[in-house]
Amino acid sequence: MDDAHKSPSDKGGETGESDETAAAPGDPGATDTDGIPEDTDGDADADLKEAAAEEGELKSQDISDLTTVEREDSSLLTPAAKKLKIDTKEKKEKKQKVDEDEIQKMQILVSSFSEEQLNRYEMYRRSAFPKAAIKRLIQSITGTSVSQNVVIAMSGISKVFVGEVVEEALDVCEKWGEMPPLQPKHMREAVRRLKSKGQIPNSKHKKIIFF
């Protein structure tokens, strides 16, 4: 009797549950994804090709951008800047050509030296003033310490100066009809002649008096 008096809703609920249970094993709406093999290799190859294509496009774009920037920079240069750039390039080429000419002239000159002249030239090239002595001399005169570049420059200038004095002394010795080695009188006469030519500055300061 109790079963007969159950509400229709209770019956319907039981019926719905049994229907769901029966439909679950063979649900036609459910998709069986496990049974379909995934094409992962094909997708990976496609992704790699796409990435390579994008990278190539980016590289070509960067190159074109750089070329455009260079063209814009060259177009933005004023005529004066362009002329300065051309002048600098021409000066550099001219200097290189002059250096090559000087080297060639020096080679021709050395090849024409006699044995005595060649020995003197080699001795002159190898000779050098001691930098420590030059540095002490400069510091004693100026009263301040100097850099190594100043010492090197003064050492080179001193070498050139001594070479000019010796050359003039050799000319004096030849004009006097005497033979080397050089003597103090030849050196004194050479210094006197160089001073008279204005090639050696006067070490004694003379006060100029206006009348």
From Swiss-Prot:
Pfam families: TAFII28
Top-level taxon of the source organism: Eukaryota
Transcription listed as a keyword: yes
GO MF, one annotated term: protein heterodimerization activity
SUPFAM superfamilies: Histone-fold
UniProt main location, coarse: nucleus
Subcellular location: Nucleus
Keyword terms: Acetylation, Nucleus, Transcription, Transcription regulation
Alphabetical list of InterPro entries matching this protein: Histone-fold, TAF11-like, TAFII28_dom
Primary role: The TFIID basal transcription factor complex plays a major role in the initiation of RNA polymerase II (Pol II)-dependent transcription. TFIID recognizes and binds promoters with or without a TATA box via its subunit TBP, a TATA-box-binding protein, and promotes assembly of the pre-initiation complex (PIC). The TFIID complex consists of TBP and TBP-associated factors (TAFs), including TAF1, TAF2, TAF3, TAF4, TAF5, TAF6, TAF7, TAF8, TAF9, TAF10, TAF11, TAF12 and TAF13.
Subunit description: Component of the TFIID basal transcription factor complex, composed of TATA-box-binding protein TBP, and a number of TBP-associated factors (TAFs), including TAF1, TAF2, TAF3, TAF4, TAF5, TAF6, TAF7, TAF8, TAF9, TAF10, TAF11, TAF12 and TAF13. Interacts with TAF13 both in vitro and intracellularly; also interacts directly with TBP.
Biased composition, class Acidic residues, residue ranges: 35-45
GO biological process, one term: RNA polymerase II preinitiation complex assembly
Coiled coil: none
GO CC list: transcription factor TFIID complex
This protein's domain notes: TBP and TAFII18 bind to distinct domains of TAFII28.
Region of interest called Disordered, as start-end residue ranges on this chain: 1-74
Family the entry assigns: Belongs to the TAF11 family.
N-acetylmethionine: residues bearing it: M1
Basic and acidic residues bias spans: 1-14, 46-74
Protein name: Transcription initiation factor TFIID subunit 11
